[in-house]
């Protein structure tokens, strides 16, 4: 029986990548050393990290005036790093409140004495749609914070808000490399790797050069300029996580690149949404135009029935469908490495469940 992992993160990895990792565990590139033990100062790893950066630049068409930084600490650390590095003029940022992770970003910014102005919120409708900017932008805003994909609520931004000369920064953790964006539309992009890029332990930061280097007396581990100057080698980077991410990037190139993967992701999501929309048992609460292609929440409206759906799914090799604890129900995460056959298997199971229980 095939196994399909619908976890929101850490998430499914491409099978060819897992096979390459297995081969590198005993001896990486015939060095006699495992990938888990090579030095971050070695020529072997220098090639790994340089290749990973170049492949990322190729896939996303990253302009030359942007730096690519390899951080640790997850996207959550960037909720602190971003205001410390970029909110240096007025210590004031704007935030689009699209749900849990946007709120977390605002909370962390306030912890470092940054004023947070909520520019729009969809809280009144339980985050079933994306917020819009509801007021003129204050010229004292150092930047506007956007969560491009809301993993819990199941919404995703494709049409970016107009912010004029105010930099737009994006937490892309859950649709990084799963949806096409133009890097030059952003001052900063950050993303935890554990959705579409690799195992947990690595965070990618892509930042425009002119925005960094203005903060003073930053903690070293949060300093974008320092990491840029040291080529992400200020301290020991997450060697294995960067290696695994590099393999995923090469796999993504082999799949046709970002445009091809975006199209595949839209097709996978459409298959599931089309079923949910015609279902008499399952519903998706999200406004159709704002639906995520990465994370699809759905419910029966009955907690006991939801639990039965999840338990039965596990018996059919459909794993990790339980929704986030804050919303309940089910959630299917359809990241890049989830094949169309996995989504079809889920739809077939849900249809059979509905026929039996409705």
Regions found by a protein language model. Give the residues of each.
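Conserved N-terminal alpha-helix of the aminotransferase class I/II PLP-enzyme fold
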Residues: 32-78, 85, 100, 108
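Active-site phosphate-binding strand-loop segment of PLP-dependent enzymes
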Residues: 109, 121-176
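Conserved active-site segment immediately N-terminal to the catalytic lysine
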Residues: 169, 183-194
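Conserved PLP-binding catalytic core of the aspartate aminotransferase-like
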Residues: 282-313
